[in-house]
UniProtKB/Swiss-Prot annotation:
Region (Required for interaction with MAT2A) residue spans: 319-334
Record-listed NADP(+) binding positions: T37, G38, L39, L40, Y60, S61, R62, N71, L72, C93, R97, Y159, L185
Origin: domain of life: Eukaryota
Family annotation (CDD domains): dTDP_HR_like_SDR_e
Name this polypeptide is given: Methionine adenosyltransferase 2 subunit beta
Record-stated family: Belongs to the dTDP-4-dehydrorhamnose reductase family. MAT2B subfamily.
Record pathway: Amino-acid biosynthesis; S-adenosyl-L-methionine biosynthesis; S-adenosyl-L-methionine from L-methionine: step 1/1
Length: 334
């Protein structure tokens, strides 16, 4: 069912100005996006918006003026918002995703990644909303890839543990919810440090200084536009099929180390890469990370859900605004 509300506009004509009232149709399908100010959340918000959904995006520190301010740790505020908006779907993108920050702020990370997710699951169930909880490949230890949805999790760090606890809390409190595990993400960042992939670009551009790049951990960089499309496809399939629930995996299919990512970035922009040095030793002293947490995505592929953008295409779209050499940017894109 679609709702209607009034909108006003000013009409100008020679010698005359008038205020005109129009009936505006509001799409009947309502989506609530948490973490809508973040890298993935922005992409999900845009994907649903462009596909005729009435979308309410929520954020915290960067919420105003575009998005609704919402403290996910305020259970009463979460309940009030969901009861008022009555979404058909909630895409839960908000999380503390940085492993090093989780290690240094464990209590806050647990509140956001676990407790807030549990509360959201309960409220979603209360209004009959389909909830997609975005999780991580870090729930696995990376020793026996590829990992299926029913593979036994064994997170190596606190971030992975909080995401796994969040999964279990969501599925325990909302049997109709879905968990979508994804790997490291990149996309249209507001600053290079917003993604563990795009932050590498400065190492590529400043070729006057050699840079040691990790060539040990195996990653599958995934474009946020692809994940957003999968969220939309899952949601629209769920509207027709209530069996769409439980755990799913989605990932890019190009296996790359950080060294290989930076070489691909250099290739995408025709930049030198000889200053980049591969380091094959396992990092020492850092927060433990899985060697190869590759996700098996066949469960979604078998039901015709998925979208993949080649890394060199997606990374070029994401990084060209940050090119130091503006001449190249003008030549290629204008």
């Amino acid at each position: 069912m679609e709702g209607r509300h009034k909108e006003y506009r000013i009409r100008f004509s020679p010698g005359w100005v008038e205020v005109v009232q129009d009936d505006v149709t509001i799409p009947g399908r309502r989506a609530l996006i948490t973490g809508a100010t973040g890298l993935l959340g922005r992409a999900v918000y845009k994907e649903f918006k462009e596909n005729s959904w009435h979308v309410l995006g929520c954020g915290y520190s960067r919420a105003r003026p575009r998005f609704e301010y919402l403290n996910l740790l305020d259970a009463a505020a979460v309940k009030a918002l969901i009861q008022d908006f009555k979404p058909h779907v909630i895409i839960h993108c908000a999380a503390e995703r940085r492993p090093d920050i989780v290690e240094s702020q464990p209590e806050f990370a647990s509140l956001l990644n676990v407790v807030a997710s549990e509360n959201l699951a309960k409220e979603a169930a209360g209004v009959g909303a389909f909830l997609i909880y975005v999780s991580s490949d870090y729930v696995f230890d990376g020793t026996s890839p590829p990992y299926r949805e029913d593979s036994v999790p064994n997170p190596l760090n606190l971030y992975g543990k909080t995401k796994l606890e969040g999964e279990r809390a969501v599925l325990h409190n909302n049997e109709g919810a879905a968990v979508l595990r994804v790997p490291v993400l990149y996309g249209d960042v507001e600053k290079l440090s917003e993604s563990a992939v795009t932050i590498l670009f400065d190492k590529v551009q400043f070729s006057n200084k050699s840079a040691n790049m990790d060539h040990w951990q195996q990653r599958f960089p995934t474009y946020v536009k692809d994940v957003a499309s999968v969220c939309l496809q899952l949601t629209e399939r769920r509207l027709q099929d209530p069996s769409i629930k439980g755990i799913y995996h989605w990932s890019g299919n190009e296996q790359m180390t950080k060294y290989e990512m930076t070489c691909a970035m250099a290739d995408a922009f025709n930049l030198p890469s000889s200053h980049l040095r591969p380091i094959t030793d396992e990092p020492v002293g850092a927060t433990p990370r899985p060697w190869n947490p590759q996700l098996d995505c066949s469960k979604l592929e078998k039901i015709g859900i998925g979208q993949r953008t080649p890394f060199r295409v997606g990374i070029r779209e994401s990084l060209w605004p940050f090119l130091v050499d503006k001449r190249w940017r003008q030549t290629v894109f204008h």
